[in-house]
Amino acid sequence: MRNDLKLLPWEICSEADGWNDEFLESVFFLGNGRMGVRGYLPFEPDSRPTQQGLFLAGIFGEIKDGITDFVNLPSPVCETLLLNGTTAVLASPIHRTLDLKSASFYADFTLAAGDTRADVRYTRFFPKELPALLMQRFEIHVQSDAELELRSGINLSSCNSPIPDDQVKENTELVQLAPLQFVTDDGSLFSCTFETVGTGLRIEQEVQFHAPEFTQGIVQNSGAEVTCPLTAHAAAGQTLVVEKLVCIRTSRDADERIAAAPGDWSFHALWGAHTVAWSHTWQNCDRTLPDEELQIGLRYSMFQLMASCAAHDPTVSIGARGLTHARYKGCYFWDTDLFMLPFFLKNDKTAAKNLCLYRANALDAARDHAKKMNAAGARYPWMAALDGSEQCETWDIGCSEVHITADVAYALGEYCRETGDEEFYLHKAAPVF
């Protein structure tokens, strides 16, 4: 059992050696409900295609006809630092902090190339009310005069490793489900466009920098990553700052708040609006407990629910591992209807309604599934994803889970009872009942 986490009322902290720690990367997950990334870091020299990526609600690609997997998308957490022309490597422990109050992730560490050292403070957040954006900030403090080159962009190597529903089978296959289609570079920003295999969903990641002390170079595509070089001279004791905005939009966006990247943006202004939004959220749902460990445990659990729920999108639900992993194909299970929905019924009725709308709008797929099972009416599937059809491939699990329809009906009934939403009852819930 790991005991190397420091638990505070609003923060989880750790100090560890080395880049690769899958346990910590799970703990330090960050998201805004629409999309999220695990707690991996920029500057890691080794590529880990299945562990480094970004998950975005509703983005599925086909691994076989009619069967999808939750796409591990190319990652915009992709940086390399050169000091005096030499690639810098990790030269200290890494201190990570997840601040639940502001839904922010920080990391502090030192990079070195020969005798040249740079202390790095890294910040990451997903603006709560601007769900298309990912913000990152790099504060690089050099201990001696140095020529800096920061190569920043998008890691193209992210892959899925589909795990068979028959768990006696091994999963050794790597599949890239969102290959690069093209790169656009207009000098001040660049974008990469991807398309999912089989489902044909388009994803655009646009990257912009605020780096007044750096010179921005020409975008380069190595095949493994698309990066832009930023170069600068730093005097001993100087701290240089790079701010990176990534705007991610898709061909299936349903949340009306999703918009193009702002033409004129301020990291601090976006940060301020983000913290205010989370402050309002916590004022509504926070509960205080006398025990510190129980307190952070409760807040962490609530944060995970909110960070994994696309509250304004009625076309998706909360997957088996939220936005952290493609296990179980990223499918939606009855756990959301019975165990997660009650939190949203009490704290975010918009989210609760949209979780229920996902099920109600999948009624036709449930009817089709009932016919395939030689049954009357509707039968909701064990594993659901993009269109509500059954995604489970083994008869001994999917065919035997007969309680799902009752779970869905119960959840819709609880929403109607809690909210008194007559329109939803008449037009959405009643046909299911």
Locate the predicted segments by residue.
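A conserved hydrophobic secondary-structure block that centers on an alpha-helix together
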Residues: 129, 414, 418-424, 428-431
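Short, glycine/acidic-rich beta->alpha junctions
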Residues: 130-133, 224-226, 331-337, 425, ...
